[in-house]
């Protein structure tokens, strides 16, 4: 069958279409994988309300995605909404608009989000190596720890790029650093992982992390380059220092830079650097497979 996943995030809205390989097979083939920046979660950190214009533009993108699904004879479309919709008191206004399009819609917990990211990033891996999968989003960041093909331990923390853009209007990066480490330290799971003697590898998913490769190399986005790339803490720190000292117009000259990411990429890079510092890790492996694949597996296989 041909199935579709729509991931409705705080900053972006993504469409993933794939075809399963027979009724009893666990294999699937990607057909479509696209993203649009919709900023559904703008202002939600403070107001807890989804902005009317943000709702309208996100639903317009979902309408476009539905047409793409129809053009590819998709049998079922399933949408998953994350942090912004979770936090909003007026989430029903958005949910009803999506459901009118004939889409199976779910508002998921941060734990479910983290499990999907872990599954997507590790489902092709074998062996006894443990992984900590990190998914930096606009409203929250998920940390998922465990072995491939097992159910990971997950914590979702309300630290994300859109939140930080809004918070930085009233605080400095020095204050943000303290805030990040306080939020990470509150998690019993993360403190436990931090103190472990066993070896584990960091895997980073989503554009804030994978995009660091192309900022560093000054080349256009190419998932074949970023997937599996070992991103060093020195590269991340260098990217932050460079981005921080650039104007938004200068950031736009970076070949891979999306015009709607020029503001969020700076606090996002800062967050990634602080996460590696927290865990005392020098490298994180980038993965272009993430919660889209994870959701597809759990929904259709």
Describe each PLM feature range.
Residues 1-29:
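N-terminal basic/disordered segments at the start of proteins
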Residues 3-7, 131-135, 202:
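Short glycine-aspartate micro-motif
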Residues 11, 75, 282:
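Short acidic/polar active-site loop segments enriched in Thr and Asp
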Residues 12-14, 140, 209:
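Structural motif
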Residues 17, 43-68, 82-95, 99-130, ...:
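Helical "lid/coupling" subdomains associated with nucleotide-phosphate turnover
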Residues 25-44, 60-63, 70:
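Conserved ATP-binding subdomain of kinase catalytic cores across diverse folds
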Residues 76-81:
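Short beta-strand segments at enzyme active-site cores
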Residues 138-145:
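Acidic, divalent-metal-coordinating active-site segment for phosphoryl/phosphodiester hydrolysis
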